[in-house]
Amino acid sequence: MKSSTREQTPVTSPTPHDPTPPTPPRGSTPLFSRGSWLETRRITDVLRKETIGGALLLLGTVVALVWANSPWSSSYAGLRDTVIAPSLLHPLHLDLTLGQWAADGLLAIFFFIAGLELKREFVAGDLRDPRRALVPVAAAVGGMAVPAVVYVLVARSAGDGALNGWAIPTATDIAFAVAVLAVISTHLPTALRTFLLTLAVVDDLLAITIIAIFYTDTLAVLPLLGALAVIAVFGLLVQKRIRSWWLLIPLAVVAWALMHASGIHATVAGVLLGFTVPVLRSRAAGGPEAGPGMAEHFEHVWRPLSAGFAVPVFAFFSAGVTVGGLSGLVDSLQDRVALGIVAGLVVGKAAGILGATAAVSRFTRARLDPSLSWWDVLGASLLGGIGFTVSLLIGELAFGAGSVRDEHVKVGVLTGSLLAAALAAVVLRARNRVYRRLHEAERVDEDADGVPDVYQAPRLNG
C-alpha cells in the first residue's frame, strides 16, 4: 500500500522549504553538479587549508603594503633586495635576492602542488570524465582568453612594451578567493566550490604553460636536458613507490636549479615533478580502494608548507608597492597597463568564465543544475577575477621586478582583485539564504551512515 502511494506522489519543483532540486531532464549533463561524497570531502579539506593560507596571504600583503608606505620603506626595499648568493651557486645563475628566491624558489613548491592536483584531477577526479571536464576547462580557457583581449584593447596605446603584460590578468588565486568566501561568510554550495577549485587547477596549468612559452628570453639546452633527465629519475623513483625524502628532495632541488639555469622559469620544474607522481595505489599496495595514492600523500605533506609559508612569503616580498597616498594611486592607475589589468580581472575574467559556461550550456546537452541560477555562476566568475600570486609573478617576468611599470602592475593587480572580490561578495551574499538551505540539505543523514543522503540519491533511486 505504501509503495502504491509513493508512486502516485507527483514530483514538484523545490519550494523555499524544500531545497532538494528536481531531477534534470534525462540525457542532459548538469552543470556544476556536486560529484561524489569522497571527492566532496577531499575538496572541503583542500579549501579549508587554502582558507588558512589565504588569510596568511592577506596578512603578508597587508604587512608589505604598510611597511612599504611607512617612514621605514627603505628597510623593506633593502630586505627584499638583499642578495643571498653562495659562490658555489654562481655557475647556475643563482645569485638571487630574497625577493627572487621567493618568486623562483618558494613558488616552485606552489606549482608542485598544482602539478599534483592537476594529475589527480585527470586520473581520479572530475577531469577524467570529458563531460564533467568540459565546463571547468572551457571556463578556464575563456577566463584566460577574454581578460588577455581586454588587456590588449586597453593597453595597446601605452607603448614601451606594454603588451608584454597581456597574461597578467589571466590568473586566478584560489587561496585569495576562498579567503574572501570566509570573510563574507557565505555557505557556497558544494557544486560551486568544486567548480572553483577545478577551474583554479586548470588555470594554473594554463599559467605555467604561458610562463614557459612566452616568458623565456633565452634557452640553454644542456641545463634543460639535465633538468629533464633528473625529473625522469625522480619520476622513476616515485613510480617505484620510493618515498625517501632524503633522496627525492635533493633530486627536486637539482632539477629546479638546472631548470633555472636553462632560462625557463624554475617553477616549471615544480609542475613537471608533480606530474610524475602516481595518483592511484598499485595493485601490490591494495589498489585504489586501499586508500589515497602517493600524489594525495605528497599533497597532504606539502600543501601546508605551500599555503602557509611559500605563498604568503612571496606575497610579502612582491606586494610591497609604495603607493604614495591617493594621488599616487591615481597616478599609477593612469598607466594604461594598470587600467588594462583592472579591466581584465574585473570585466574580462567574469565575461570569459560566464560566457564560456553559457556557451557550453547553449551548444551541448549540458544544463545548469536546477539548484543553482546564473547569478551563482556570475558570483563564481567574479571570484575568478581575484588574480594575485601568479599575476604578480607574470608582472615581474613581463616588466622586470622593481621597475616603475612593475609597481604599476602591483597597483593594478591589487585594485582589480579587490574590486572583483567586492562585486563577488555583493552577488554571493544576496544568494546566501538559498546557499544556507542547500548547505543544510547537503548535511542531512537520516540513515546515520556517515554519508549525507544527497550523495546516495543516485544509488537509492537505482
From Swiss-Prot:
The gene is nhaA2. It is found in: Cell membrane. Residues 16-27 have a biased composition (Pro residues). Residues 1-31 are annotated as: Disordered. It comes from the Bacteria. GO terms for cellular component: plasma membrane. NCBIfam families: NhaA. It is a multi-pass membrane protein. Belongs to the NhaA Na(+)/H(+) (TC 2.A.33) antiporter family. GO terms for biological process: regulation of pH. This is Na(+)/H(+) antiporter NhaA 2. It holds the Pfam family Na_H_antiport_1. GO terms for molecular function: sodium:proton antiporter activity. Na(+)/H(+) antiporter that extrudes sodium in exchange for external protons. It catalyses: Na(+)(in) + 2 H(+)(out) = Na(+)(out) + 2 H(+)(in). The keyword Metal-binding does not apply. The keyword Ion transport applies.
